[in-house]
Structure formats: C-alpha cells, structure tokens
Amino acid sequence: MSRPQGLLWLPLLFTPVCVMLNSNVLLWLTALAIKFTLIDSQAQYPVVNTNYGKIRGLRTPLPNEILGPVEQYLGVPYASPPTGERRFQPPEPPSSWTGIRNTTQFAAVCPQHLDERSLLHDMLPIWFTANLDTLMTYVQDQNEDCLYLNIYVPTEDDIHDQNSKKPVMVYIHGGSYMEGTGNMIDGSILASYGNVIVITINYRLGILGFLSTGDQAAKGNYGLLDQIQALRWIEENVGAFGGDPKRVTIFGSGAGASCVSLLTLSHYSEGLFQKAIIQSGTALSSWAVNYQPAKYTRILADKVGCNMLDTTDMVECLRNKNYKELIQQTITPATYHIAFGPVIDGDVIPDDPQILMEQGEFLNYDIMLGVNQGEGLKFVDGIVDNEDGVTPNDFDFSVSNFVDNLYGYPEGKDTLRETIKFMYTDWADKENPETRRKTLVALFTDHQWVAPAVATADLHAQYGSPTYFYAFYHHCQSEMKPSWADSAHGDEVPYVFGIPMIGPTELFSCNFSKNDVMLSAVVMTYWTNFAKTGDPNQPVPQDTKFIHTKPNRFEEVAWSKYNPKDQLYLHIGLKPRVRDHYRATKVAFWLELVPHLHNLNEIFQYVSTTTKVPPPDMTSFPYGTRRSPAKIWPTTKRPAITPANNPKHSKDPHKTGPEDTTVLIETKRDYSTELSVTIAVGASLLFLNILAFAALYYKKDKRRHETHRRPSPQRNTTNDIAHIQNEEIMSLQMKQLEHDHECESLQAHDTLRLTCPPDYTLTLRRSPDDIPLMTPNTITMIPNTLTGMQPLHTFNTFSGGQNSTNLPHGHSTTRV
C-alpha cells in the first residue's frame, strides 16, 4: 500500500521544532545547574555584608553526627592597625573596603615571646606550658596589625530558642596578659551544640598592650580598650550574622577572666554586653592589676636605651623601637604579680576594683563564676621530689617565699607565716608528705583563686543581682599532669568548648572517655543557657541520653542562685550536687583574719613578754647557734637541710662528739610561736565572748528598767518621735567620727593591715618592693577640661549629666 504524499513532509516540518525544543530545554537545564551551583557556592562560602564591607566565610562540617555544620568567618578586622603613631594609643575603628574580603583563614596574632624561660608558668594552664611546640604553630605569624576576631555561626535553629536572633558569646583568651591568641580556641563545637554565635578575639598583649608610665604619656590598658572596641564592632555588626546585640555574654579563663571582671567595672563597656562568665580569676586576684606600672616601664626603657627623664620623650623613643626588640626583653615581676597588665588609670579602670565592686559598678550584669579544685597545682609542681610529696623544708620554704612576695611590710611576717602554716597543716596526718603536698596546693588555690572569687560573688549578690557559683572537680586523663593532681587551672576550658566530642587535639591531648563527653555536653548546656536567659537551668534541660546510656545525674540537680548568706554553689563533677559555703573556713581566714592580724600581733607580743622562757646559754651549744627569742626567717633562701636529713653528710652512728649535738639541736622544732598563736586566738575569742555576754546582759537589764519608765507608743507625740530620730542620727554620726579618728590613729604604727575599713583587695595584693604601692587614683589623669588639653581618645561617650544622683555612686550603673 502506498503512503500518501503529504505525510512525507511531516518529519521535515517537525525537525526544526524538535531542535528548538531541545535547545530551550538545554538552556533551561544549564541555567538551573548554574543556579544550583551558585546556591551551593553561597552555602559553602557564605557572604555577609558588614558596616565596613562584605566578607566571605567558610561552611565547615564537624566530625560528630550530632553536631551541625558551622559557618566560620576568620580574621575579621575590628580596628585599625595599632602601628606607628597608634602604638600605645587606644584603638580606632577599621577602614572600609570595596569588593568581598576573604575571611577563611586566621589573621596574624599579636606580638608575644613564647620563651620557656620568660613564661609565668605558675599562672598558665598545664595544657599551655606543656604544648609550647604546638602553640608556636598558632603564633608564628605575628604582627602589630593583629586586631582581628573570629566568628562561628551555627546553621541549625534551636527549638528551645523562641528568639530568631541568636545569643552571642565572646571569649577573651587568657595567658597572664603576655601570651595567647583567640585563634587557638575553636568555637565551632560550642556554637553548634549550644546554637549560639561564638566569637574569639585577639588583643594587644604585654608591653604593647599594657605599658604605662602612670601619667598622660602612656596611660596603659590598651589591651582592655581593644576588647571594648571588639565589643563595639560586635554590637554594630553581629545582627548581620543572625546574632542578637542585646544578648551578648563575655567569658574567659585565667587572665581572660580577670579581663571580663574588669570590663564589668568599666563605663566604657556599658551596654556592650549583658552577662559575664568568670572562670578561675577575678579583678581581686593579686595578679589581676599592676600597681607599679611606672617601675617596670623604667626597667624596659633602661634595657632598650630609652631611659629619658621626661616620660613623653621616653614613650616616643619606645614607640620608634622595633616591636621585636621590645617583646624579647625579659622583665620578671615578683611572684604572684605581673609586670605588664591592667592598671588603675582613673579612666578605663577609675578606681581600685574592690572599691568599684563595693560601689555596685557591676550589678547590672548577670554573673556566673567559679574555680577549679586544684588551681594552685603549678605553684607546687616545680617543687623538688613532689611526686613523693613535699618535705617539711620545702613546705616551710614555699610558705616563706609566699609571704615575702605578697606582703611587703617587715613587721609581723613571722606571725603571718606561722599562722598560715598552722592553718594549712593537717594535724591528723601532719607527717605525711603527700598530705603536706595536698594542703600546699590548697593554700595557693585558696589565696589566688577561691577567696577572690567568693569575695566577688558576695559583693555582686548582696543586692540581689543574679549570681551563680560553681566548683569544677573533674579533669581528663593526660600524661601532661602528675597522677596525684586534681582539676588544675584551665582544666575546664576543653569541656566548655566541647573538645571531648571530637576527640583529642594537639592542644588538648587527653584520653577522653564517654564520661568526659557527657560532662562536656553538660557544661556547654549550662554555659549557653546562661547566655540565652541568664539562668543556667533554662531553657534547654540536661539530657545526654544520646551520648551515654547511663542516667545523667545533672537532670536531677537544679543550680541554685548564690547569695552571701547561704553561698550555694554547684559541684561540677561526675557526682554533681548543690552545696553551700565553699571552703568557708579557709575563705574566712583570708578575708577576715589576715587583714586584722596586726591586732593579734599585739596580743602575741604581750603573751611572749609574760611567758617568755630565758634563752639557753650560748656555751651549751659550742657548734650550734643559739635560737633568738624572736625567730628570724630567711627572706627567699630555702631552709638548709640538716645533716640528719641529708645522706651526703651523714656521720658514723657510733661516732660521738660535738657534731652529734649539732644534729640533735637542728632537728628539733620550736613550737612556741604556734603555741602563742593558739593561746592568743583562744584568749581573744574568750574576751569577745565575755564582752558579748556583758553587752547582752546590760541591754536586757536596761530594757527591763526602761519598760517601767517608757510611755506607751500611743503617748509619744510627733515631736518626741522626731527628737528620738534626730538623737539616733547624731549618735551614728558621732560613732562614725570616732571610727574615722580610730582609723587615722592606727595608720602611724600599722604593721600588717588597717582594720578601718578591712581592705581584702590590697591585703592579697601587697607588693614586696620598696617602692610604695599606688593608691587608688594616684595616676588619675589630668582633667580634659584644662585649657589646651585635647580629649585622650574617642571612647568617652558618656555625657556629664547622664548619671542619676540616686545611684550608690556618682558614676554608678547599679541596678536600683
């Protein structure tokens, strides 16, 4: 059958149409592929528009299935380079840029000298000092142009967080104000697990960050001002990353915690954050503030040939030096102190930190703070033969060195030294060297960390400001630490940043167990909850069944608020519990007894004059030295080891002679001072009890007589009531005047510490040097209102009429 002729043309007609359709489909598919590629590229390399220009980040997956990916923006500039004329000056905002800036790699770190010999080992975590080779990889790229921050943004929403904007947590790294960088702490895990934006920052360190001449030439505190500038940048730009500028929490450990504490007291940071987490360090620690900045600046100037008499010329000379020459100078401060750190400049830090706390300068912030069980490990770790415990000689030397470096007054040292040894001797096991080692660690822990933290918590909570206190009692298993060590300084850091969830790293080379993973999840939940609501218990409950089949004991624990009366705190460990009055006896010793030891010293002198036994005759000890009535201690020398304790000098046991007598004398210990301490304390307590009972009896007897004479309240007229009130006010004023006169009369012969009023801060931070301590506002700056005086910097944005006269202090931010 033949095909119709017209149908022969159909294939020819449809061929162009098919070609056209295929071309359109191909173009559509190509466009779709390009679109998906762009979307994928945007997801892989997200771009954010800041106030200074666009930046490109990097989307990074995490090696744990329970953790979502995180967007990282690394090396974002928050200030102009502090170089040239900007050295030793407050930071300035960064310059804008065009195009898209790549922020996928870390920027340079601030100059520092990681030398084994120059590090303040006692104030640094073990994971820091034991990994200097690893740390060198983080700080190889050094430059004065170092004011950058790193931003870690989670990509998954939190069903518990009703606010579309995410809370922001800003970490201020530690390192004794001399070392460290925000680059070495990865905030990805904390950001992903807690659904918060985590930011780490670099700030100027050491000489470049804290040099001060004590006057207008170089005020100091540039590192603190860098942190404040970073917070200002965050307030302006974090909204572009999905962050909430009204929910910013700053947190830090060690020197970083002290910076956090100081920022809560500075008006320059007002409104830039709302909450603070202070881990193992406050502004009240002996190493938190440098009270002799001009002294160390002069030492530096001598070393580099800038010892000009005029401080302005000296600073100009230092400004023209190469930064490497400056940071390589070794300037060693007294133990427990710092050479370059925050100073009381009358501006950024307007007064002594304790005075500012007492005035309520930090009450507008919610605060969570705490300590680790064995913070003072590094102070004891260097003692010879500490693996087998601490010998009596080493114990005596450590206490003597401790007193000599912290308390600069010549009189009363013997009393203080013996009292400290008395308090930190386990009398039930006093001959055990391991027990002696444990109590020595406790001594340094209590003085340097626990007492300052409790004092800070008391001052913050006394008016009802939200305060939470913790004690960290866990640490990972690592070869970096001795087997006998407890949770030491900085041991909480890997748990805060979730390191156990991804396994050991070069910096935290621990053998993490499931318990470590569980505890890290618990800690991150507490920390991020506090950042979200100010309450570590809300909104996310403690639930770690996805990590550990065992029940999470933290589910049954509610972290209670801290108050000065109950002093409740959370014991963070594998057996959590809420307890009260953390190390109350030892804290009271440092906060209450030590500031008043000069009163007890007078009692000791009275007891010694009435019960003194005549000293032995010198002729009785032909080869020994007669013990003086007042025991004389060496200032820094280690007590000599007697021949009886030194095998190298042991003698024949059958040999007799004068040497045997010498050994016998030197191995004896005189407990007269301890006995005097005990008698004096007992006598003073008895005397106080007698006074209390006498006062109680007198008031009771007086009240009984007055009930017969006093008219009923209804018969008192208004004038009578007003008269009584006036008399009470006048009585209080007279008592205050007598109190002031008493304080003035004590100043002339005070040996240890004034009792009016008790000053815990300076008691802990007395300097041993001959140069007098800087009193608060000693280096307060010349007012800017003087003729020809230009404003020091652009940070002062507070108007003179901004403060309320109803606040506790003329410039207070106290919550009323």
Swiss-Prot record:
Quote the tissue specificity entry.
Expressed at highest levels in heart. Expressed at lower levels in liver, skeletal muscle and pancreas and at very low levels in brain.
Q: Does the keyword Protein transport apply?
A: no
Extracellular side of membrane: 42-676
Positions where Phosphoserine occurs in the chain: 712
Instruction: State what changing residue 214 to S does.
Output: In a colorectal cancer sample; somatic mutation
Task: Provide the residues annotated with a glycan attachment (glycosylation).
Answer: 102, 511
Q: What is this protein called?
A: Neuroligin-4, X-linked
Q: What species was this sequence derived from?
A: Homo sapiens (Human)
> In the UniProt record, what gene is named as encoding this protein?
NLGN4X
